[in-house]
Amino acid sequence: MNNVFEIINQARRKNKLKRELQDNQKKIRDNQKRVTLLENMLDYIHPTMTTAEVIAVVENMKADYEDRVDDHIIKSAEISKSRRDISRKIRELTEADKKANK
């Protein structure tokens, strides 16, 4: 019976990680769009139109967004690994419970 509770607990944890992964993927997508936007801005902003400081600010913003995308990609990989580990543990617990009930 303890395995049943553990299986339920692990399944809930796995579902929570799935939701977190989806949220993280949305953040990746949003930040990639921002990077694209800033790249386009850099194509249109020239020193003759504005000061070089504006370009430096835009480049810094772009670098910040790229760093965020990288951070979210790493976090997604970590979450995916946790989900796989939980799935493996659920499978092992289920098999052990089946053997114990035979």
UniProtKB/Swiss-Prot annotation:
It is found in: Cytoplasm. Keywords: Coiled coil, Cytoplasm. Pfam families: DUF496 (PF04363). The keyword Coiled coil applies. GO terms for cellular component: cytosol. Transmembrane segments: none annotated. InterPro entries: DUF496. Residues 7-34 form a coiled coil. It comes from the Bacteria. Pole-localizer protein involved in the regulation of several cellular processes. Belongs to the pole-localizer TmaR family. This is Pole-localizer protein TmaR. It comes from Aliivibrio fischeri (strain ATCC 700601 / ES114).
